[in-house]
Amino acid sequence: MAWTPLLFLTLLLHCTGSLSQLVLTQSPSASASLGASVKLTCTLSSGHSSYAIAWHQQQPEKGPRYLMKLNSDGSHSKGDGIPDRFSGSSSGAERYLTISSLQSEDEADYYCQTWGTGI
């Protein structure tokens, strides 16, 4: 039984040594004309390119609205009632939200979020 603490310590050191800080970076702002398209970018920090993210929208005076979960392979699942004009894609550590045929109600803050585990 003397090996148990050593094994635990080895696993603990391995886990803590493999952690690196996860940071999401978004493009600061974007603008486009009604009817046009816009592409927003969320970049995962080095070593986290396999992570999924979620895109959210927050219109003025309203709570956040879940738009979609976006995986590293570009597959995504949208929230209820999200129009087809909203789509997601991925390339390496970058996750994109594209809004096509912009409408006035699309004027909002958009932000990305992750859960801190690779998927």
Swiss-Prot record:
PROSITE patterns: IG_LIKE
Location in the cell: Secreted; Cell membrane
Keywords for the protein's UniProt record, in alphabetical order: Adaptive immunity, Cell membrane, Disulfide bond, Immunity, Immunoglobulin, Immunoglobulin domain, Membrane, Secreted, Signal
Region (Framework-2) residue spans: 53-69
Region of interest called Framework-1, as start-end residue ranges on this chain: 21-45
Domain Ig-like: 21-119
Main location: secreted
Signal peptide positions (record): 1-20
GO BP: adaptive immune response; immune response
Chain intervals for the UniProt region annotation (Framework-3): 77-112
Presence of the UniProt keyword Secreted in the record: yes
Disulfide linkage: C42-C112
Region Complementarity-determining-1, residue ranges: 46-52
Pfam (any one): V-set
Sections of the chain in a coiled coil: none
Quaternary structure note: Immunoglobulins are composed of two identical heavy chains and two identical light chains; disulfide-linked.
Protein name: Immunoglobulin lambda variable 4-69
Organism expressing this protein natively: Homo sapiens
Taxonomic lineage from the root: Eukaryota, Metazoa, Chordata, Craniata, Vertebrata
